[in-house]
Swiss-Prot record:
Belongs to the TMEM158 family. It comes from Rattus norvegicus (Rat). N-glycosylated. The chain crosses the membrane at residues 215-235, 263-283. Residues 1-20 form the signal peptide. Residues 20-43 are annotated as: Disordered. InterPro entries: TMEM158. Residues 31-43 have a biased composition (Polar residues). This is Transmembrane protein 158. Glycans are attached at N73. One of its GO terms (molecular function) is peptide binding. It is a multi-pass membrane protein.
Amino acid sequence: MLPLLAALLAAACPLPPARGGATDAPGLSGTPPNASANASFTGEHSTPRLLASAASAPPERAGPEEAPAAPCNISVQRQMLSSLLVRWGRPRGLQCDLLLFSTNAHGRAFFAAAFHRVGPPLLIEHLGLAAGGAQQDLRLCVGCGWVRGRLRAPAGAPTALPAYPAAEPGPLWLQGEPRHFCCLDFSLEELQGEPGWRLNRKPIESTLVACFMTLVIVVWSVAALIWPVPIIAGFLPNGMEQRRTTAGAPAAAPAAVPAGTTAAAAAAAAAAAAAAAVTSGVAPK
């Protein structure tokens, strides 16, 4: 009777498996392991390991992205009629994307330009201007990031198990690189008073050219007034010809004038002597 009761109790209440037996080592027994139990067991041990590795490993992207966004530090200067010089602060990031487009065309950009991975300062040339000199409002947006390239873990370093399938390697613009954009609204008419616009100030070259041309005009004006003088003087009667004619005639001795004669008498005597000399030179031989 007792052996029968012992057999019934053993059949009704099976003993739990001992540790280290075939149940703990599914590879040693021919039966496949329990999938649900194995998954729960693995999950219980892998979750703390993931948390520990994530807490111990330093973040791949340092604090500049987690810091609050810096205020917009963007300045725009007008260099020429259709060019702009843009500057922004380095704390916004290492590599920046710049967008420039017009905003006063009722939802349609009259002019738009994009620059990828540029640094300050940036010169934007061939700026589209509105027809008829109309007011043109523009918006400038600068977005910067702190990633220079794909960050790779050092060889042999333990890595956490990914919770999702890893993305295939590719360009950063395909990986959704974060950008912090900061925009500035301005008008081209407001930039005309900027000191950087060269059209509002006279360069030294223009001043020198103006001075040189003024000097040339003055010299030519003086020369134009002087050069006709010798030509006009050639048509005037020359006193040298009369002197040569008088020297070629025989010199007549002037008559002696008494000391007591007056000036009128002396002049009359001189005129008579001159007439006699002319008459003697013209008389036929």
